[in-house]
Swiss-Prot record:
Keywords: Cell inner membrane, Cell membrane, Ion transport, Manganese, Membrane, Transmembrane, Transmembrane helix, Transport. This is Putative manganese efflux pump MntP 1. The keyword Cell membrane applies. Pfam families: Mntp (PF02659). PANTHER family: MANGANESE EFFLUX PUMP MNTP-RELATED (PTHR35529:SF1). The lineage of its organism: Bacteria, Pseudomonadati, Pseudomonadota, Gammaproteobacteria, Moraxellales. It comes from the Bacteria. HAMAP family: MntP_pump. It is a multi-pass membrane protein.
Length: 197
């Protein structure tokens, strides 16, 4: 496996941590629900989070391709800075319980035996905004954007699916740890983009 593929996989795992943490929270909130409901929730989490996390970096990549020509000399600093800021934001959210607050607000209104697609769509978009910003750096990492976005989507879908079951069985104590891991990986990739060419 070459270094570029390792970077794509690490980026995919880091970007999936928001969706993973939200999925753990959704699973934890579903502990009293039927097995059929939890399976449907896991499938929808995989679909919503996977598609959003795959499309948003592609949008960021396309925007980045346009901006890269204008900002060629500053691009590594800008791209690395974006990843470092995203990582720092994930760490901040992990230590301040912001994901739990979003889930509490959503679930207080929607706890029932049917999937609330509006809530799932909103959570998918909210967790994938960071992925759009990270997509800008795909140009700087010299990665195949289509392959990278496909891997990001598949990894996120897997984390979304299994996060539901992990949350159902273990509760919410893993949410913050997933955010911390994702934040640290994004910071490391950002430093690499800035200083190692």
């Amino acid at each position: 496996m070459d270094i570029e593929m390792i970077e794509v996989i690490l980026l995919a795992i880091a970007l999936a941590m928001d969706a993973f943490a939200v999925s753990i929270g959704l699973g934890a909130k579903s502990q009293k629900q039927s097995s059929a409901y939890v399976l449907r929730l896991a499938v929808y989490a995989a679909l919503y989070f996977g598609i959003a996390q795959g499309v948003m970096p592609l949008i960021g990549y396309l925007l980045g391709a346009v901006l890269l020509g204008w900002l060629a000399t500053a691009a590594p600093w800008l791209g690395g800075g974006i990843l470092i800021l995203l990582g720092a934001k994930m760490l901040y959210e992990a230590f301040n319980g912001e994901i739990e607050a979003v889930l509490e607000d959503s679930f207080d209104r929607n706890m029932q035996e049917k999937i609330n697609h509006r809530m799932m769509f909103t959570l998918a978009i909210a967790t994938s905004i960071d992925a759009m910003a990270a997509g800008f750096t795909l140009n700087l990492l010299a990665l195949n954007a289509w392959l990278a976005c496909s891997i990001i989507a598949i990894v996120t879908a897997g984390f979304g699916f299994f996060g539901i079951y992990l949350g159902k069985s273990s509760g919410t104590w893993l949410e913050d740890k997933a955010e911390i891991l994702g934040g640290l990986v994004l910071i490391a990739i950002g430093i690499k983009v800035m200083f190692i060419r």
